[in-house]
Regions:
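Mature, structured domains of secreted/extracytosolic soluble proteins
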Residues: 21-842
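Sec-dependent bacterial lipoprotein signal peptides
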Residues: 1-21
Length: 842
């Protein structure tokens, strides 16, 4: 092979050299090796059975390139293949019954779509430039070689195309380059495609030892010419439609296509110099690679597929640009039910699997809501062809993580598109039916861990979620993503167990939940957390997850922060009025919402990860900003406040003899959620200067006390009196309820501080504004001044330090290293007050 390549290079070089040294060229030409054939064009012409292909080359302007210059790879077909094509039903319907009836655009497509840059053997075509497996490659087909002019009758019938009822449009099925799909022996070996797979991909008799381009067999390969290589096909070289195009044009799939038409729209590709608009067809989809979540008017899509089935350069899970080469190694797969299968599913027959949907929506697919239709459609999409071939059917999972329940005898046909394979199947793979937010968890085979966790043997959460009088937003994590859970209890452990990571899994033998415990730093397994039955330790952690991932009440589009059932703050990421991701205070980045179901009592949203709580206590955060963190201080803005708390003994380790804080906690916090408004060092100094509180040195020296106040008190009692004044000041800066910038709007919402009014025996109030961008506080002192008609002021939180999330955790053992569960906890959101400010209660 190396020798052949060398002669090709020599041959090409000599051809170029002829322009400057004719006699030398002629001398070398006479010494060409016997195996080196003529140029590409002459070879085809001399065969005598490639008249159509030679004419194609001439008509498309490639005569000189194929005869004299260039470095070409060409897939060609003899005349017999053209004659077969002219007699085909598709060609007859389009009027292509002879060569002279082919439009120029069709000729360009026939030639350029089977041309590849540079001269390459089949073996070389199987490899990327970096030596990887090359399953798909682009062709020399120009995107605008053929642009269909579509009338309204042939457009998808939906609201996005209705504006074109009275006209026509130039509509590309996709605006990315076309690709060839190479079922070459080296490729199939690398991708572990079997003979059995090939039977369903390319038909009976197909073998991994043979070479195929799409579903066309290469009957003769590596034909060597002076200026390139030729590979002969057993049928005319026509790049197939993409998946969406095939489904649209295949009569047996018209019902499925009718539903899919709801979720596409024309998007402007470009405007020509003549002002003519060219559009491309886009499908609404939620993929990371090539998402299309809003329509051209900026509205949230009525429903979304997992990916765009029309994207020629389909690639799943990469950065998703048309120049990214991630498409080379794989393509998509779609399992599309035939019309007969759809009718059998969606039927008046009470035994039909889709009978309930049929009854609910009047027996018409047109009445089925967009979201349900989208759920049904995308349940038939898989991100990887390679991982969904028939040899994988026994373990095949859909993109929500549960079994596809597909068998080989369900396949009644297949079509290799340029961006994926379409399997025609004789059954519908339906969405899950449910009423409450836990319904999907009850029936979804991909949510077995959550299903068990909600049940009687673990957290008994099902009784709570059954309430139809409440509104829930339930964020559930699929089994395959029930991993990388940072165990909050393990922060109190030592050695390799400290800060453990849990990967939950199902023990199918005992129908219980286990967790592989890993070291966070190394990722190494350090054991399996289970008792062989129902583990109390796991129940504690699962309860924490369920509480963290359940919102009670309505959610408002645009509002970012919410407080969960377990008092944890979580952030929602919106795209218009749709939640596209969620983030716990302990997550480094948002967790994608990969599915959503609206139910009677709320919504169920699938996550591809576990929402984490903050790993830091309030003590830890104050210490970090007091120049005293063991891991290195961030700054010292909280130093004065931290020093006061520490001096007053407000940080405690063991609230009781049977439990302990992970590090330290504020002693007066209960199991609830709070806001802490921390005066900076200058704010504390201002309070001291205004005589509101004593300094620590004042307390030690018993300053700022009158004889009347301290009559009869000894020195320590005097200090304690001053210390209590400082404690009451500290406690007034911490209120019940977490106020978060970006959370629920407040307009002088009244909340209770942690400082008790000993006269009324009620806690002093704090009045708070929160408008999505700032928190402003009216303390009780200024509130009373306003009531009296006096001047007053509100205090803003700092734009520099705010929305800092903390969690004070108490575990069920006096020794944190022996803890197995969570005893109690509190959540806090910490804000620094603006420079020089503090809060007064009187």
């Amino acid at each position: 092979m190396k020798i052949h390549r060398l002669y090709i290079v020599i041959g090409l070089g000599l051809t170029l050299f002829a322009t400057s040294c004719t006699d030398r060229f002629e001398e070398e030409e006479n010494n060409e090796p016997a195996w080196l054939g003529p140029n590409v064009y002459d070879y085809l012409e001399q065969r005598g059975d490639c008249r159509y292909f030679c004419q194609l080359i001439r008509d498309c302007g490639y005569y000189e390139s194929m005869k004299r210059t260039g470095s070409n790879t060409l897939f060609f077909s003899p005349d017999s293949c053209f004659e077969t094509f002219f007699r085909s039903a598709d060609a007859v319907n389009k009027g292509y019954t002879s060569y002279d009836k082919l439009p120029q655009s069709m000729k360009y497509m026939m030639l350029r779509s089977c041309m590849v840059e540079n001269a390459q053997l089949i073996e070389r075509l199987s490899k990327t430039d970096h030596g990887g497996t090359l399953f798909r490659r682009t062709t020399m087909m120009e995107l605008e070689d053929t642009i269909p002019v579509v009338t309204y009758a042939d457009m998808p019938h939906n609201i996005y195309f209705d504006r074109y009822k009275d006209g026509e449009m130039k509509l590309l099925m996709d605006a990315s380059p076309w690709t060839l799909v190479q079922f070459f022996p080296d490729v199939m070996s690398a991708l572990k495609i079997t003979d059995k797979d090939m039977k369903y991909i390319c038909g009976d008799g197909a073998s991994i030892d043979r070479t195929y381009l799409f579903q066309s067999r290469i009957v003769r390969q590596d034909i060597t010419c002076k200026n390139g290589y030729l590979h002969e096909l057993d049928r005319i070289c026509m790049v197939p439609d993409n998946m969406a195009g095939y489904i649209r044009n295949e009569n047996r799939l018209s019902t499925f296509n009718h539903l899919m038409d709801r979720f596409c729209e024309p998007v402007l590709y470009r405007t020509t110099v003549d002002g003519e608009r060219i559009y491309e067809l886009r499908y609404f989809n939620e993929s990371v690679s090539h998402p299309h979540r809003t329509d051209i008017d900026g509205r949230i899509a009525p429903g979304m597929l997992y990916f765009d089935p029309g994207w020629n350069l389909y690639q799943y899970g990469s950065s998703g640009t048309n120049s990214n080469n991630a498409y080379e190694g794989d393509m998509a797969a779609m399992f599309v039910p035939t019309n007969e299968a759809m009718a059998e599913y969606f039927s008046a027959d009470p035994n039909a699997e889709g009978h309930d949907i049929y009854e609910s929506f009047g027996g018409s697919w047109d009445n089925v809501p967009d979201q349900i239709a989208a759920d049904l459609l995308k349940n038939h999409q898989l991100s990887s062809f390679v991982n969904s071939t028939p040899s994988h059917f026994g373990t095949l999972k859909d993109m929500a993580g549960y079994d596809m329940e597909i068998k080989e005898d369900n396949i009644v046909g297949s079509y290799v598109a340029r961006n994926g394979i379409v399997y025609l199947i004789n059954k519908v793979l339906p969405p899950l039916d449910y009423r409450s937010v836990m319904g999907p968890v009850k029936v979804d085979q991909g949510l077995k861990i959550f299903n068990l966790a909600m049940g009687d043997n673990y957290c008994q959460f099902q009784y709570y979620l059954r309430s139809l009088k409440s509104t829930f937003n339930f964020f559930v994590t699929l089994d395959e993503y029930m991993k990388d859970y940072l165990d909050p209890i393990s922060a109190g452990y030592s050695g390799v167990r400290m800060n453990s990571i849990y990967d939950f899994r199902l023990n199918t033998n005992t129908n219980t939940i286990e967790a592989v415990v890993r070291n966070a730093a190394t990722g190494d397994s350090i054991g399996i957390n289970t008792s062989g039955g129902i583990s109390g330790a796991l129940t504690s952690r699962l309860t924490d997850i369920l509480n963290q991932q359940t919102l009670v009440g309505e959610i408002i589009p645009g509002q970012e922060w919410y407080i969960t059932k377990g008092y944890a703050p979580i952030r929602l990421v919106w795209a218009g009025d749709k939640v596209v991701a969620a983030q716990g205070a302990g997550n480094a980045s948002p967790i994608d919402v990969i599915d959503e179901y609206d139910k009677t009592n709320g919504a169920t949203r699938y996550l591809n990860g576990i929402l984490r709580t903050s790993p830091y206590s309030m003590y830890n955060i104050l210490r970090q900003h007091a120049g005293a963190s063991a891991s290195g201080s961030v700054d010292d803005k909280f130093k004065a406040f931290y020093d006061m708390c520490e001096y007053c003994g407000l940080f405690e380790k063991n609230p009781t003899t049977t439990c302990a804080a992970i590090d330290y906690r504020l002693s007066f916090l209960s199991q609830y959620h709070y806001s802490a408004y921390i005066p900076g060092n200058d704010g504390v100094e201002a309070a001291i200067g205004d005589g509101i509180i004593p300094s620590i040195s004042d307390i030690e020296n018993c300053s700022l006390t009158s004889e009347e106040e301290t009559a009869g008190l000894d020195l320590e009692e005097k200090r304690e009196m001053l210390r209590q004044r400082m404690i009451r000041f500290i406690r007034y800066h911490i209120q019940d309820y977490s106020i978060i910038i970006g959370g629920q709007n407040e307009n002088e919402g009244q909340f209770l501080s942690s400082t008790l009014n000993t006269t009324t025996n009620k806690f002093y109030p704090i009045y708070v504004d929160q408008d999505g961008s700032n928190v402003r506080i009216l303390d009780n002192y200024n509130y009373q001044r306003r009531r009296q008609g006096l001047s007053f002021e509100k205090v803003d939180v700092s734009s520099e330090l705010n929305n800092i999330m903390a969690r004070d955790l108490i575990v069920n053992s006096a020794a944190t290293t022996a803890a197995t569960g969570i005893e109690t906890y509190s959540y806090s959101v910490i804000h620094l007050l603006e420079d020089g400010k503090y809060l007064r209660f009187e």
